[in-house]
């Protein structure tokens, strides 16, 4: 975080601090003893317009477990945007598959059905759609293309909490969505955290089990057990569970999302309106049916319109020198 007069981010209040203290003093601090994470999963699924959610330790493992549930592995190719954070790509490599980069559109900076189609091969098994900076991918043509080629679609919503595509929340359109609650994201669960959402019960069950050493929800919660029953592992997995202290923060921040989203859009709109008045800057226009999450506020420089001695980097440096957070990339 730059040393600026602007409000700090992440932003916590006494409400989060008191809630975390209550969880710790309850001694019910993980998924198996507390109820905060289970409640957070239900509330986040409802908020994102999906049937199911699995809370996780961070957003990177959300991508990992999504690929695992879709049985992505050696010999498979996954098409991913050429403009994204490393985790969208490294998760594919860590699954043993091959990332294939598709070009992005000039305005949205997202890949499109056309750029995806150009790199498909018989080995392509899935797509990772990154809603970069909060601008939704054009999902209808992408889903049509996926259906035509029998491909699975993961929505990477790490930067898009609150964005909508043609009236639908992002994350509710593909087969699985992966979310991040890292400290710099639109909402955070105390520094790290993640979630996967889906409308497919089998995918949910597979992800829920894998993140908890292969325990089955059905085996643990829906069967009768003799006294003294502990755990039944019906498959192998790992431990990517979210902590109760993370979940209680997430529940509080989720309740603030409507207010925060409105504030983000208001601030972004003011920046974009001013930038449009400057001939050396270009501001893309979002499709009217979509809603931006305003995680980032992109403005593009027209180098040919700059005065002598000016460049993108000088513009950034001048803004930072005046205490305005500004970055490239």
Task: Describe these PLM feature segments.
Residues 284-329:
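Conserved PLP-binding catalytic core of the aspartate aminotransferase-like
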Residues 120, 143-152, 195-215, 310, ...:
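Basic phosphate/pyrophosphate-binding loop/patch that engages nucleotide-derived ligands
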Residues 68-157, 164:
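PLP-dependent aminotransferase-like
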Residues 1-29, 232-234:
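N-terminal "arm"/small-domain region of PLP-dependent enzymes with the aminotransferase-like
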Residues 90-92, 145, 169, 186, ...:
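Hydrophobic/aromatic ligand-binding patch that stacks against planar heteroaromatic rings
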Residues 26, 30-77, 91-94, 101-103, ...:
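Phosphate-binding glycine-rich loop
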Residues 160-166, 173-296:
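Active-site region of PLP-dependent enzymes
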